[in-house]
Every structure is written in structure tokens, then in C-alpha cells.
Swiss-Prot record:
The gene is Drc12. Component of the nexin-dynein regulatory complex (N-DRC), a key regulator of ciliary/flagellar motility which maintains the alignment and integrity of the distal axoneme and regulates microtubule sliding in motile axonemes. It is found in: Cytoplasm, Cytoskeleton, Flagellum axoneme. It comes from Mus musculus (Mouse). This is Dynein regulatory complex protein 12. Residues 1-20 have a biased composition (Basic residues).
């Protein structure tokens, strides 16, 4: 350091003067040496004080920076805890919501399965009843067709018999009808002539 170099130079110079000087000069040299050493000590003390001041300022800055970092860390940790707590709350809420929804869906699926089974049973029963009704209806229709065919045959036979009987009766009474019609016709023409009418003009 510069003060040390300066001190050493002065000490060497003082030693040289000490060898070649008188007692008064030696005393003066000692006095100067003491002053130089005092000055050197003051310089060292000032330097140490400056270094201490700088170290204290650096320490204060570091402490301030450390406090800022600690505050930022605490704030970050607090925010992190708040975020974690909020995420945990949302996760729990979502879990509960999903659990509730899952139970609802399971209940709906169970209910739909029961309804489906009921509908299938009812459809099967209705199909069986419809098939039985169709078979019964087919049997009834077959019986009706047979009965109608039998009745048609009987009615046709009765009709033919009645027509034959009627024709036979007509053949028996036709000669009498013809004579009566002829007499009636002759009488009507005579009556027309009596009224002065010609039957051929009518």
C-alpha cells in the first residue's frame, strides 16, 4: 500500500542520517520518525475506517437486499400457499362434483336399465299376447269362412229349391193366368170403345 512504501522510504532515509549525524540531528530524526509513524498509523487508521465504512455500507446493502429477498420469498411462499390452497379447494370441489355427478349417472343408468328390462318384458308379453290373439283370430276367421261357405251352400240349395218350386207353381197356374188376362184385355178394349176410344191408338 502507498502509505507503507512512503514509511519505509522515510525510515531508510532516517537510518542513513542517523549514522552520519550529531545527537541533535538524531533527536530530530527520531522526532520526525515518530511523526512519520504517527502519520502512517493515522493513514492506516483512516484506510481501515474507510474500508470498515465501505464494508458496513456493503453489509447494509446486502442486509437490505437480503430483507427484500426474504420479503419477496415470504410473499412468493404466501402466494404459493394461497394458490396451492385455492387449487386444493378447487380440486376437492371438482372431486366432490365429479363424485356427485358419477353417482347421478350411475343412478340414471340403473333406472334406465330397469326401465329397459320392464319395457322388454312388456314388449315380450304384448308380442306373445298379440301372437295368441292372431292365432285365435285366424282360427275364428277360418271357422267363420267355413261357416259362411256352409251357409252359402245351404242358402243356394234353398234358393234353387224355392225357385224350382215357384217355377213348378207358375207352370201350373200360367194357363189360368193367360185366360184371365185375355178376358181382362177383351173387357178393357170393349170399355174403351164404349168411350169412343180406339185401343190401337193408345
Amino acid at each position: 500500500m502507498p502509505p507503507k512504501t512512503k514509511g519505509r522510504g522515510r525510515k531508510a532515509e532516517a537510518r542513513k542520517k542517523k549514522k552520519n549525524s550529531s545527537p541533535g540531528v538524531e533527536a530530530e530524526a527520531k522526532h520526525r520518525l515518530v511523526l512519520l509513524e504517527k502519520e502512517l498509523l493515522q493513514d492506516r487508521l483512516a484506510l481501515q475506517r474507510e474500508e470498515a465504512r465501505r464494508a458496513k455500507a456493503s453489509e447494509d446493502r446486502l442486509k437490505q437486499r437480503l430483507q427484500g429477498l426474504e420479503a419477496e420469498l415470504e410473499r412468493t411462499q404466501s402466494e404459493g400457499k394461497a394458490i396451492y390452497a385455492e387449487m386444493s379447494r378447487q380440486r376437492q370441489a371438482l372431486k366432490e362434483e365429479l363424485g356427485t355427478r358419477s353417482k347421478q349417472l350411475e343412478e340414471e343408468v340403473r333406472s334406465l336399465k330397469e326401465q329397459l328390462e320392464t319395457c322388454q318384458r312388456e314388449a315380450k308379453t304384448a308380442k306373445e299376447e298379440a301372437e295368441r290373439a292372431l292365432r285365435k283370430q285366424d282360427g275364428t276367421l277360418a271357422q267363420l269362412h267355413a261357416h259362411v261357405a256352409d251357409m252359402e251352400a245351404k242358402y243356394e240349395e234353398i234358393l234353387h229349391d224355392n225357385l224350382d218350386c215357384l217355377l213348378a207353381k207358375l207352370r201350373v197356374v200360367k194357363p189360368h193366368w193367360d185366360a184371365n188376362v185375355l178376358r181382362l184385355h177383351t173387357r178393357l178394349k170393349e170399355q174403351l170403345r164404349q168411350f169412343g176410344l180406339n185401343p190401337l191408338d193408345l
